[in-house]
Amino acid sequence: MARQLDYPTVREIFTRFQAAEPEPKGELEHVNAFTLLVAVALSAQATDAGVNKATRALFAVADSPAKMLVLGEEALTEHIRTIGLFRTKAKNVMKLSRILAEEFGGEVPSSRAALQSLPGVGRKTANVVLNMWFHYPAQAVDTHIFRIGNRTGIAPGKTVEAVESALEDHVPAEFALHAHHWLILHGRYTCVARKPKCPACLI
């Protein structure tokens, strides 16, 4: 685990990220807050590409909690069969759809606590939704960000929570909204787990 980089160095890193990609975007396809929530929940232990392949047809017929409930668990399961843990995920999506319909007026809540009260929604999923849909500077730490935080010293920590805290403490405020996307994309395409592409690295 690398030592925590100083503030000027972290600022310079994110300045470079911003220059290279001013408006980074998440790669999960969605059309509203509900489809984003479902896509992120389905993405655990799966690739974004795999989730997108399954959800294109799904979201064409079920892009709201009410429509998901009409679709039903059996049909949902068929749509997401190619995604890992699809049976458990289907049950969770149906449960969270019912809760959203009955307790939240069919709307996705904008608080972390409310999001995490939904079945199958942990802190990382809640943070992604808060960041991507509600534009809150939440840092969703996935395997890529955990690796980069520790490998580079941008946000070292022994746990996901520690890395998230380090990001919140050390990423300059003007970069906080997009920080998690820059780091995910950097980890996905450059600072990969095996044989990182160091000659192409902005850092």
PLM regions with names:
Residues 2-203:
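Catalytic cores of DNA base-excision repair glycosylases
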